[in-house]
Design a protein with these regions (language model features):
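ABC-type ATPase nucleotide-binding domains, specifically the catalytic core motifs of the NBD
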Residues: 14-23, 65, 80-82, 109-127, ...
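The feature captures the beta-strand-to-loop junction immediately N-terminal to the Walker
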Residues: 46-48
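Conserved small/polar residues in nucleotide/adenosyl-binding loops
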Residues: 51, 151-153
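Helix-to-loop junction immediately C-terminal to a conserved catalytic motif
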Residues: 61
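Conserved ABC transporter NBD signature motif
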Residues: 69-80, 88
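Conserved catalytic motifs of ABC-family nucleotide-binding domains
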Residues: 99-113
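Conserved ABC ATPase "signature" region
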Residues: 127-145
Length: 153
């Protein structure tokens, strides 16, 4: 069983025009995408500007309304945002393309990295510090960077 399975995903935006501002056409931002994501693997979605990469990501996390298709999470169809389980919201998140504008420059690096750990894990201070250190090492940063502000990095 796949972690996330997307079948025939369609996200369309209406084009309005005329005197009464009626829908005259649609922009087919995503039209019939199939995608399978296995648990524990890392994926990248690559394409030209305007090809629908961000729209697919936003549809997966519920920020875009889906015109058609299904998104299945661990065998369960995710239909409406309200029906999504908290474990789905904990496990499915989006990393923004422009990390410099999406991170708070007043926060220390340790606080930025530890925020999801604090929200979704029950770690002691020592366990949290150790996990942050492991995560810093993965991206090639030292423990010294943990106390820096985002604006310094």
């Amino acid at each position: 069983m796949s972690f996330i399975d997307i079948k025939n995903l369609k996200v369309h935006y209406p084009i309005r025009g005329g005197f009464f501002n009626r829908i005259v056409d649609h922009v087919y931002a995503v039209d019939g995408v199939d995608l399978t994501i296995e648990k524990g693997k890392t994926y990248g979605l690559v394409g030209e500007s305007g090809s629908g990469k961000s729209t697919i990501g936003k549809a997966i996390i519920g920020l875009e309304k889906i015109k058609d298709g299904t998104i299945t999470y661990e065998g369960k169809v995710i239909e409406k945002r309200r029906s999504r389980k908290s474990d789905y919201n904990q496990n499915i998140q989006m990393i923004f393309q422009d990390s410099l504008s999406s991170l708070n420059p007043k926060k220390r690096i340790i606080d930025i990295i530890a925020e999801p750990l604090r929200n979704f894990e029950n770690l002691t201070d020592n366990e949290e510090r150790k996990r942050v250190s492991e995560l810093l090492e993965i991206v090639g940063m030292t423990d010294d960077a943990a106390e820096d502000r985002k604006s310094v990095v």
